[in-house]
């Protein structure tokens, strides 16, 4: 039971780091502005990206939004077949699901209908009213351990109270390839 709880806590921390990590003593998240020349604060890390307002998912609006991911900061073209949209559960149910769900002629609902193939992932780490459109294969996260971390325990610390102390460790770091990944 303890090991499962520690692993879940580790997974939540990894999710937070990948989505919204500041880059200061933690990985750089997808929502951070890392373009060349941006100032890195020693107290708060990288600043958050400036949000782009999206009012609908019509091809004329969604296409240019996805096209921003197709060119790297150095001007090279990037090829991809699908993008990932990360949003929180409330925004998915209130905004994205109603805009991308349609009733089929067979009487069933087809969901997540986007003009460009898009996988929607829900994360509690994304702020309400925001979403992240990204290319997950362009985010590098290197681990020094297995993804489950390393669980250690000690009976020495609280020997007299007959209690065992557990801790979990994971060494890793990650960052997007460049500022155009998300």
Where does each model-flagged region fall?
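Extended alpha-helical or coil "stalk/linker/tether" regions that are enriched in polar/charged
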Residues: 46-87, 95-103, 108
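Intrinsically disordered or highly flexible coil/loop and linker segments, enriched in small
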Residues: 15-19, 23, 75-82, 175-179
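Alpha-helical scaffold segments that mediate packing/assembly in large oligomeric complexes
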Residues: 1-68, 182
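Feature targets compositionally biased, intrinsically disordered low-complexity regions
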Residues: 22, 28, 36, 44, ...
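Sequence/fold signature of self-assembling virion shell proteins
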Residues: 4-8, 81-84, 89-182
């Amino acid at each position: 039971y303890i090991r499962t709880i520690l692993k879940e806590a580790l997974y939540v921390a990894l999710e937070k780091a990948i989505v919204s990590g500041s880059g200061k003593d933690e990985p750089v998240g997808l929502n951070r502005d890392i373009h060349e020349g941006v100032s890195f604060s020693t107290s708060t890390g990288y600043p958050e990206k400036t949000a782009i307002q999206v009012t609908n998912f019509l091809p004329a609006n969604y296409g240019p939004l996805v096209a921003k991911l197709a060119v790297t900061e150095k001007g090279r073209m990037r090829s991809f077949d699908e993008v990932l949209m990360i949003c929180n559960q409330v925004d998915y149910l209130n905004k994205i699901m109603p805009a991308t769900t349609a009733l089929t002629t067979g009487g069933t609902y087809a969901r997540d209908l986007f003009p460009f193939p898009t996988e929607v992932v829900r994360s509690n780490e994304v702020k309400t009213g925001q979403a992240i459109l990204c290319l997950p294969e362009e985010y590098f996260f290197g681990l020094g351990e297995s993804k489950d971390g390393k669980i250690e325990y000690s009976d020495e610390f609280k020997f007299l109270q007959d209690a065992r102390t557990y801790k979990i460790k994971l060494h890793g770091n990650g960052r997007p390839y460049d500022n155009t990944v998300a």
